[in-house]
Amino acid sequence: MSTPSDQHNTLSAGKCPFHQGNSNQTAGGGTSSRDWWPNQLRVELLAQHSNRTNPLGDDFNYRKAFSELDYAALKADLKALLTDSQPWWPADWGSYTGLFIRMAWHSAGTYRSADGRGGAGRGQQRFAPLNSWPDNVSLDKARRLLWPVKQKYGQKISWADLFILAGNVALENSGFRTFGFGAGREDVWEPDMDVNWGDEKNWLEHRHPESLAQAPLGATEMGLIYVNPEGPNHSGDPASAAPAIRATFGNMGMNDEETVALIAGGHTLGKTHGAAAANHVGVDPEAAPIEAQGLGWHSSFGSGAGADAITSGLEVTWTQTPTQWSNYFFENLFKYEWVQTRSPAGAIQFEAVDAPEIIPDPFDPSKKRKPTMLVTDLTLRFDPEFEKISRRFLNDPQAFNEAFARAWYKLTHRDMGPKARYIGPEVPKEDLIWQDPLPAAIYQPTQADIDSLKAEIASAGLTVSELISVAWASASTFRGGDKRGGANGARLALAPQRDWDVNASAARALATLEAIQRTANKASLADIIVLAGVVGVEQAAKAAGVEITVPFAPGRVDARQDQTDVALFEFLKPKADGFRNYRGVRSSTPTESLLIDKAQQLTLTAPELTVLVGGMRALGANYDASAHGVFTDRVGVLSTDFFVNLLDMRYEWKATDATAEVFEGRDRESGEVKYTATRADLVFGSNSVLRSFAEVYASQDAHEKFVKDFVAAWTKVMNLDRFDIQ
């Protein structure tokens, strides 16, 4: 017979999960749904950066806080910081100039024109993966050096703005005259999970330059900002690096002149660090132990800092005055003959074989070195087109200074959107084409004007579907990443947007609205287009038995064609727009994932996505006037029919062909085809999260709520680019 003691021992040996204290029951622990279903639709991307993660609360206004900042005092403190060398991370030549320029560059340099994501606008360098990228080694120290300044000024200056301003001050302190600085970057409080950094699983995997043109990636290797400084795949060949350089800088919207200026300007100051082999360097900040307090890459070589520092593994100092602006980069590039050598860490670099020792040692004034350069620096001499520009800058330092000032400004402000978002005393007056400039408003419609225009639009013979389609086509180009696109400017009427196939269904309505604008002669076409959507929604709601006034904020203006860079606006052409049941060039990305991507660009939540798709299907707003997803026999009525019929078990769905892109919904009893749908429709019944929202709107008590929610989400999209009223 067993005793209580025996029973206790048996339970202990079996490790009863209820009382042993070693079960991983912490929040978020254990196997997740994504472990079981790795291709699960990422609806959670639409919940990023909510107020629940913002410690500053709903009432915080960054623009107001910045207006109370002593800007001159801040810049003075940054200038003092540059030469306040800290023993835990000693400054090269007693100055953090190069370090802060690199921090600013790498903060901004993740931007990609293709999808507008990345860039400096959110202060993402604080978070993974960027805080631990191989190309960002030691920038954790730069951010810690900045902390006393950030701590002093608190929320009057965001981290995102501070990173860039610190780089500007570093340049100015070196004797360079910058083009200006615009603040207005608001911090977020968690990593951007929507950015596709690539599919590679290992750091520094090589990408062919041609592949970069087919994906919104900004670097030739996973974990780099731009290109491998040792040449493609560590080739050591300067000439072969030219395609990669053009591809990566081109993905940011930089031309050859801007590219040369940025490379040379960025390498006029500071140095790289490669005192010893990389095996001395510890884990990155995200992998570091808790006592490291967010710092990574601890080095076991010597002191691990100062003269013993290891970052890229390259040991290069470009110029004789690494803390003072000069034209020595180009002078050295063309004056000397360069031979391939290796750094103490074993990285491929070049040394000026016929040069005297003219480069000062960063910590021992009695020592000098020969000039050294990166493999990719020499590309500026050995690529024919880059060489022409480089020689011009060699012979005309002022042209170089002007080109770098403008290119640096573009680099660091590229993802900020229109100049209306810029704040601060150093914003340049000049409008630049990459800012998508708009003319000043010359007339503000009165309420009487608005009422008159609404009546004229309503009597113009346009259907609800046409009114909705033209307004959506105008507003839905907005991208939350770089704040480009949107209805303001009425660029729907300009090249290239007027010629996009996705906008073909808006052509008749656009022509009608242009005629109304010519007769009105006061209101902008941009306002009239949005007002057309207002009329359409109000008509559709009334037809559904709900009287509602759709909010409308006048004040938009009309851009000119010469204010519109056609090539840059081509990036705004949607690859897919599930709200209109549009999908362009086929890819391996599922249609429903592209729908989530589009909603994320429009800063929509999952409920907003759901109500908008359901409403637009009821209003017949498909780009090609197809019946896909139009689960109603009363098109143009703002009804919940889409949800009711999608969730109705009378229908079963089958793909029409092997692509499984289009489906037929058949009556289970008769076999009759009742509806057709795309993946962008059926996902609201198949995905468990989206279905939960669809069930709300399919309920019998949801009709009025649906109309109100649709109006709110619709108005949000129409005003996404109205930074003047936000």
Curated annotation (Swiss-Prot):
InterPro entries: Catalase_peroxidase, Haem_peroxidase, Haem_peroxidase_sf, Peroxidases_AS, Peroxidases_heam-ligand_BS. GO terms for cellular component: cytosol. It catalyses: H2O2 + AH2 = A + 2 H2O; 2 H2O2 = O2 + 2 H2O. Coiled coil: none annotated. The active site is at residue 106. There is a cross-link at residues 226-252 (Tryptophyl-tyrosyl-methioninium (Tyr-Met) (with W-105)). One of its GO terms (molecular function) is catalase activity. Homodimer or homotetramer. It holds the Pfam family peroxidase. Binds 1 heme b (iron(II)-protoporphyrin IX) group per dimer. This is Catalase-peroxidase. The record marks 102 as: Transition state stabilizer. Belongs to the peroxidase family. Peroxidase/catalase subfamily. The gene is katG. The keyword Repeat does not apply. There is a cross-link at residues 105-226 (Tryptophyl-tyrosyl-methioninium (Trp-Tyr) (with M-252)). Its cofactor is heme b. Bifunctional enzyme with both catalase and broad-spectrum peroxidase activity. The keyword Hydrolase does not apply. It comes from Cronobacter sakazakii (strain ATCC BAA-894).
